[in-house]
């Protein structure tokens, strides 16, 4: 079905709005994936706070113009599925990576974060805010415990020398 000018403008505006509020974007090719599997992916995307859309490449190029995802225009070839992460930069990458492992037909084309093309695997392994805080706290606790052990060992050695 051919789209009229107003429909095209609405699509460009919608995708542009999603791009402006997004932290990262991931581009994929979903040829060969069944409708049932794509429906599952869309449901998972909604739960993860990810906006997903299949858009014509020419409209997508116009939609990302002037945004930090303009660097992805080289990946807009063939059927293009784009996902924008709104809550966590790695959400879309993690979702697509897991889906690609289960569905060999699903091909990841690229990802962008902070205006630069990034490896999808890199984005998928980014810790969430809570995970990063937990790692930081673990490191701080570990450092404090290590310092205590070294202090006690030094005190023990000093007492042994005095005796």
UniProtKB/Swiss-Prot annotation:
The keyword Protein biosynthesis does not apply. It comes from the Bacteria. GO terms for molecular function: large ribosomal subunit rRNA binding; structural constituent of ribosome. The keyword Ribonucleoprotein applies. InterPro entries: Ribosomal_uL10 (IPR001790), Ribosomal_uL10-like_sf (IPR043141), Ribosomal_uL10_bac (IPR022973), Ribosomal_uL10_bac_type (IPR047865), Ribosomal_uL10_CS_bac (IPR002363). GO terms for cellular component: large ribosomal subunit. Keywords: Ribonucleoprotein, Ribosomal protein, RNA-binding, rRNA-binding. Pfam families: Ribosomal_L10 (PF00466). One of its GO terms (biological process) is translation. Belongs to the universal ribosomal protein uL10 family. NCBIfam families: PRK00099.1-1 (NF000955). Part of the ribosomal stalk of the 50S ribosomal subunit. The N-terminus interacts with L11 and the large rRNA to form the base of the stalk. The C-terminus forms an elongated spine to which L12 dimers bind in a sequential fashion forming a multimeric L10(L12)X complex. Forms part of the ribosomal stalk, playing a central role in the interaction of the ribosome with GTP-bound translation factors. This is Large ribosomal subunit protein uL10. It comes from Actinobacillus pleuropneumoniae serotype 5b (strain L20).
């Amino acid at each position: 079905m051919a789209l009229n000018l107003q429909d095209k403008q609405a699509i460009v505006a919608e995708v542009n709005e999603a791009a402006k509020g997004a932290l990262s974007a991931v581009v994929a090719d979903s040829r060969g994936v069944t409708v049932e599997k794509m429906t599952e992916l869309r449901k998972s995307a909604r739960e993860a706070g990810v906006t997903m859309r299949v858009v014509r490449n020419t409209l997508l190029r116009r939609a990302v113009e002037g945004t930090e995802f303009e660097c992805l225009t080289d990946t807009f070839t063939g059927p293009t599925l784009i996902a924008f992460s709104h809550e966590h930069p790695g959400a879309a990458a993690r979702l697509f990576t897991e889906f690609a492992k289960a569905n060999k037909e699903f091909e990841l084309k690229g990802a962008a974060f902070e205006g630069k093309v990034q490896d999808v695997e890199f984005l998928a392994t980014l810790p969430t805010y809570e995970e990063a805080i937990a790692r930081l706290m673990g490191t701080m606790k570990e450092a404090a415990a290590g310092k205590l052990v070294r202090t006690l060992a030094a005190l023990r050695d000093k007492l042994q020398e005095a005796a």
